[in-house]
Regions:
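Structural signature for extended repeat/solenoid scaffolds and their inter-repeat hinge/linker regions
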Residues: 1-192
Length: 192
């Protein structure tokens, strides 16, 4: 597949066995039409054990070892179907318009270092059941304008050491029924 500034490109590597044709039978116009495996250049996945697997696996250029490769593999074994994508280093995905993901069961995501998410417009997140967030060290949250929190039932907040609350202007607190305050030592209130 070849066109003006588009098409499929895969340059043969040194040592590969190629299939050569000749334009109009002219030996001065050789054309590589394909490549084949041989005893020294075997497929990336063992056969016949992995006969249900197909895909593309490249090798890193000079200086890379056997385990250095980019790969896209399809496993079509009934009950074990899988699409496996491996980037030897970076992976960059660009979507010019919308992107949709659907996962029929569970999803697990692990990031060994940092993550940055930048949403330039609105964001909506819905969890139909429970949510648990665990933060190993500190957390900072900044809201540029207003914040509203609605809790349908009870709320429990526990602070292990100190807590400081600063309100720049007014504060209104309404308790629909009873309120109990327990202070282990001193309390100081200053008005004005």
């Amino acid at each position: 597949w070849a066109g003006k500034s588009f098409g499929f490109v895969q340059v043969p590597r040194i040592g590969q066995e190629v299939v050569v044709d000749f334009l109009e039978g002219d030996p001065d116009q050789p054309l590589i039409t394909g490549r084949v495996y041989n005893a020294e250049q075997m497929p990336p996945w063992d056969l016949p054990a992995n006969a249900t697997q197909s895909g593309v696996l490249s090798r890193s250029s000079k200086g890379g070892g056997y385990g250095n490769a980019n790969a896209l593999r399809f496993e079509d074994k009934k009950g074990s179907e899988q699409v496996w994508l491996h980037a030897e280093k970076n992976q960059d995905i660009e979507v010019e318009n919308d992107e949709t993901h659907w996962v029929g069961h569970d999803r697990t995501k692990t990031i060994d270092h940092d993550e940055t998410v930048h949403v330039k417009h609105d964001r909506t997140e819905t969890v139909d059941n429970n949510e648990t967030i665990t933060i190993g060290v500190d957390r900072t949250e900044s809201v540029g304008s207003n914040e509203s929190i609605t809790i349908g039932s009870n709320r429990t907040e526990t602070v292990g050491v100190d807590e400081s609350i600063t309100i720049g202007a007014n504060r209104t607190e309404a308790v629909g029924s009873n309120e109990t305050i327990s202070i282990g030592s001193n309390r100081s209130v200053t008005v004005g």
